[in-house]
Every structure is written in C-alpha cells, then in structure tokens.
Design a protein with these regions (language model features):
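The conserved acidic donor/metal-binding loop of glycosyltransferases
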Residues: 81-85
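Conserved donor-nucleotide/metal-binding helix-loop-beta segment in metal-dependent transferases, i.e.
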Residues: 87-121
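N-terminal anchoring/stem segment of glycosyltransferases
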Residues: 1-61, 70-73, 178-181, 193-195, ...
Length: 242
C-alpha cells in the first residue's frame, strides 16, 4: 500500500553529512534530494538532482519550499534539515497536527520578531547590512507588524498540495529570490501577506520530545577553540557598535 506521507531533506554540496533516521518507520517514505552522486543510505531514497541551476544554498531552499512541485504524489510532507536526526515515527506528528492545520513548524527558540532576527543576522554575518535594511524597510512600508511570530524553519510539516499552501510557498520562493536569502526573514511577511498566522508544533530539533535531535553542521564541528573564540569576540564588538 502506497504511503501518503513523506519525510524529505535536501543536501547540496558538503555542508552536512546525511543522517539516517533511527529506523525506517511504518507509514513513512524517506527521500533525500541531492547533487552528490556517491551518497549512500540505508533508509533515505537518494534522488540525484542533475540540473543545478542555482547556487547550492538556493537549491536546498528550492526543494525545501516548493515541495508541491517535487512530491505531488504525497498528501502530507515533512521537510527536515539534513543535520536533524529523526528519532521516532514522524507520522505521529503528521496525524497530530495536519488533521487541524495545513502548515506547522517549530517556534523559533529565541525570537518572535523578524525585525529583531534581521539585526541578529547582520551581527552574525549571515546577511549584508544594506540588503537586510532594504528588506526590513520595505516590510515596514507595507505595515508588516513587529512580533508577528517566527518559525525555526528547519522542520516544516505541510499539506503541500492544497491551493492555500501552494500559493504561500510560491510567494515565499519569489520573495526569497528578490530579498535576502534568509528564509526566516521572509516567511513571516508572506504569511501575513496571505492573511495567515503561524501554527507551531511543540516538538523541535532543540526540544525534541523524543522525535528529533539537532546535530551540529560540519562547519561548526570542525572549528577550533580559537576560531570559535574569535567569532564570539567579533559578535560582542558588533553588538556594541550596531
């Protein structure tokens, strides 16, 4: 019998190792979209993407956001970042949330305001100050409110074939291609623009509640103590100046 629920990830480049779920859970298919032809897994169905028409980070986001284009044969989907270990049957979460909502994600662990997150992105060097300011100024002109909410966006649970979700995901992808490439900065605005609010799930990669475990990115794992110390000092100085 064909499953109607798929857990999927996207891994382009060598940013992360592919982490197998703890087991192949009943009622779930597991798919990994990747450009790495030698990638192997005991659980993930490896689907090689040959047409790389965007920078690798945007290829990841393309598959992350536009699930209706690549997984239309499934009714429900859960996207997980490649550095998240699935520790329990995610179908239980789909049954818990997608019977009530079309789109659910973990709440951001630290902030609920895109404007605050934008400042943090600049401080951490994740976005350029001029581009980020331009994006936030545009949102202010549109009267997008502060503290509208924020998802962590590393887990996305969706009924991805509904017209509403297709419209939201299409808008989100277009916004990401015209503004900064931080998807957390654009999603809240897109939800607001579509007269939708955040629906949060209790389970997250940071507070797994038995379902998820967050694994450090390769880049973070490979940094020396002095590299980490230098980064922290740089951030402290930026906080004073910014």
């Amino acid at each position: 019998m064909k499953n109607n629920f798929v857990v999927y990830t996207a891994l382009f480049g060598n940013y992360d190792d592919l982490i197998d779920p703890k087991e192949k859970y009943e009622g779930c298919d597991f798919i990994c979209f990747t450009d790495q032809i030698n990638l192997k897994s005991n659980i993930w169905d490896i689907r090689i993407v040959k047409e790389i028409d965007l920078p690798l980070n945007m290829m990841n986001r393309k598959y992350k956001i536009l699930s209706h284009l690549f997984l239309s044969e499934y009714e429900w989907s859960m996207y997980v970042d490649a550095n998240i270990l699935v520790r329990n049957n995610p179908l239980e979460l789909a049954n818990k949330y997608l019977t009530k909502y079309d789109f659910v994600m973990p709440k951001h662990f630290a902030r609920d305001c895109v404007y605050d997150e934008a400042k943090e992105c600049v401080l951490l060097g994740k976005t350029k100050q001029d581009e980020t300011k331009k994006q936030m100024d545009f949102y202010k002109k549109q009267c997008f409110p502060k503290n509208y909410g924020m998802g962590e966006n590393n887990i996305l649970l969706r009924r991805h074939n509904t017209d509403k979700i297709i419209n939201i995901m299409t808008d989100w992808w277009e916004e990401l291609n015209t503004q900064t490439k931080r998807d957390q900065l654009s999603l809240a605005y897109i939800l607001w623009k579509n007269k939708e609010t955040f629906n949060y799930m209790e389970e997250s990669a940071r507070v797994g509640l038995g379902y998820f475990e967050y694994i450090l990115h390769n880049e973070s794992k490979n940094k020396t103590f002095f590299q980490k110390l230098k980064e922290k000092m740089t951030i402290i100085i930026k906080r004073i100046i910014y």
